[in-house]
């Protein structure tokens, strides 16, 4: 069973910041499909970004993005047309993980997300629908939203469930700080900045 990990000091060599974008509409479409797969590799000691993985994914069940999805994610149809399938992207992720030394048993790394949706719901749900295995490294993660609540007891949460730390003003020099939702922007920027504040 997948489990959310806490953030012990200096336990991890690398933090892998991840934030999927997926097909969506109002009312919600089923199944949702991942259309953007970004990962930032942060050094656990320096908190500097050492490497990035970024690919768009061609949705199979609902190949045409809705106007709602484009408005919400900033991803247009041309960004996903002709892109690899989720299976192919997962193979590329595994190759990237190996190239970065993240599959070495002596290297401790963990994914970091804002919420449990990405790795508890979205990825395993789509993999189950498509009959694809889920790699073990996706089965444990740090939910930074929940972790921030634990580390900031007594502070009021934002109405959307985020704590004020995640919405605190960020210096303009913060990498990926800005309004563009994609690629490697938006929540990825907030996650990276917040993680640096913690560690």
Language model features by range: what are they?
Residues 1-20:
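N-terminal accessory regions of nucleic-acid-interacting proteins
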Residues 8, 13, 30-35, 41-73, ...:
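Metal-dependent phosphoesterase core characteristic of DEDDh/y 3'-5' exonuclease domains
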Residues 20-28:
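Short acidic, Gly/Ser-rich segments with clustered Asp/Glu that frequently serve as metal-coordination loops
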Residues 75-80:
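Short glycine/proline- and acidic residue-enriched helix-loop micro-motifs
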């Amino acid at each position: 069973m997948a489990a959310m990990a806490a953030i012990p000091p200096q336990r991890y060599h690398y933090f892998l910041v991840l934030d999927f974008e997926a097909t969506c509409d109002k009312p919600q479409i089923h199944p949702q499909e991942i259309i953007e797969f970004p990962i930032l590799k942060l050094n656990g000691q320096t908190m500097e970004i050492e490497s990035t993985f970024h690919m768009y994914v061609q949705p199979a069940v609902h190949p045409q993005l809705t106007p709602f999805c484009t408005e919400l994610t900033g991803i247009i149809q041309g960004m996903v047309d002709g892109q690899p399938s989720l299976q192919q992207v997962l193979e590329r992720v595994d190759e990237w993980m190996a190239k970065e030394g993240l599959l070495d048993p002596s290297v401790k790394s963990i994914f970091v997300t804002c919420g449990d949706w990405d790795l508890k719901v979205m990825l395993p749900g789509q993999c189950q629908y498509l009959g694809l295995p889920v790699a073990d490294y996706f089965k444990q993660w740090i939910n930074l939203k929940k972790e921030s609540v634990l580390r900031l007891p007594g502070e009021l949460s934002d109405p959307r469930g985020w704590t004020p730390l995640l919405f605190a003003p960020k210096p303009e020099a913060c990498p990926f700080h800005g309004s563009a939702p994609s690629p490697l922007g938006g929540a990825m920027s907030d996650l990276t900045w917040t993680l640096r504040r913690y560690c």
